[in-house]
């Protein structure tokens, strides 16, 4: 995995978050994602289109280094999103409380529950406030198809969920591949 964007120097006291559509985590690791990730020194990692069973995800990311929350798609080889927080201190010697205080892998509509397109994790920040992190994958659509209707339905559900999250948490970060451009 290569990026033309160089790593940014770390600012003490600030969280570093990376969100990446990996288009298959096994392929990303074959393209040196582990090195890319080490260079970025992130505190929170969000991935989309993971496309792998949970056991493989945990092996590749190394559970001794990361607390992993993975929403796997029921359809083999499709979608899949995750939020992971590092278990070890970052280069500034800081660590976010690695275990989320609550997690959810649904956007609130049963139709999407096993789609592997939405996962939420609540973390307590050092100041005691709550941060909710969402990793989302909205599939691309094709005009006039059921796939497009499903996409619109998912986006509509996001519009309902966002104010709910704002009520629930002090801070909300929604990242992912939203396919809305």
Segments predicted by a language model, with ranges:
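Structured beta-strand-rich core segments of catalytic domains in phosphoester-bond hydrolases
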Residues: 51, 56-141
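Metal-dependent phosphoester/phosphodiester hydrolase catalytic core
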Residues: 140-149
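A structural signal for short, well-ordered beta-strand segments and their strand-loop junctions
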Residues: 46, 133-135, 171-176
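Metal-dependent phosphoesterases centered on the DNase I-like endonuclease/exonuclease/phosphatase
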Residues: 64-67, 154-181
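N-terminal, active-site-proximal structural segment of metallo-dependent hydrolase catalytic domains
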Residues: 1-63, 67-69, 73-81
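Conserved CoA-thioester-binding segment of acyl-CoA-metabolizing enzymes
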Residues: 31-34, 149-159
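Short amphipathic alpha-helices and their capping/turn segments at secondary-structure boundaries
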Residues: 37-38, 118-128, 157-170
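Short, flexible loop segments at the rims of nucleotide/cofactor-binding pockets, characterized by
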Residues: 20-27, 108-111, 149-153
């Amino acid at each position: 995995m290569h990026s033309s964007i160089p790593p940014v120097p770390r600012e003490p006291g600030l969280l570093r978050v990376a969100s990446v559509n990996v288009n298959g985590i096994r392929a990303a690791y074959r393209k040196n994602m582990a090195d890319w990730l080490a260079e970025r020194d992130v505190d929170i990692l969000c991935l989309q289109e993971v496309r792998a069973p949970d056991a493989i995800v945990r092996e590749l990311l190394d559970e001794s280094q990361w607390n992993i929350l993975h929403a796997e798609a029921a359809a083999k080889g499709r979608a899949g999103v995750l939020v992971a927080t590092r278990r070890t201190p970052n280069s500034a010697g800081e660590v976010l409380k690695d275990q989320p205080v609550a997690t959810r892998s649904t956007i609130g509509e049963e139709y999407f529950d096993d789609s592997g397109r939405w996962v939420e994790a609540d973390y307590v920040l050092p100041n005691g406030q709550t941060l909710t992190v969402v990793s989302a994958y909205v599939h691309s659509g094709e005009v006039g198809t059921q796939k497009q209707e499903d996409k619109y339905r998912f986006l509509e559900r996001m519009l309902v969920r966002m104010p709910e999250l704002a009520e629930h948490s002090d801070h909300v970060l929604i990242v992912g591949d939203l396919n809305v451009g």
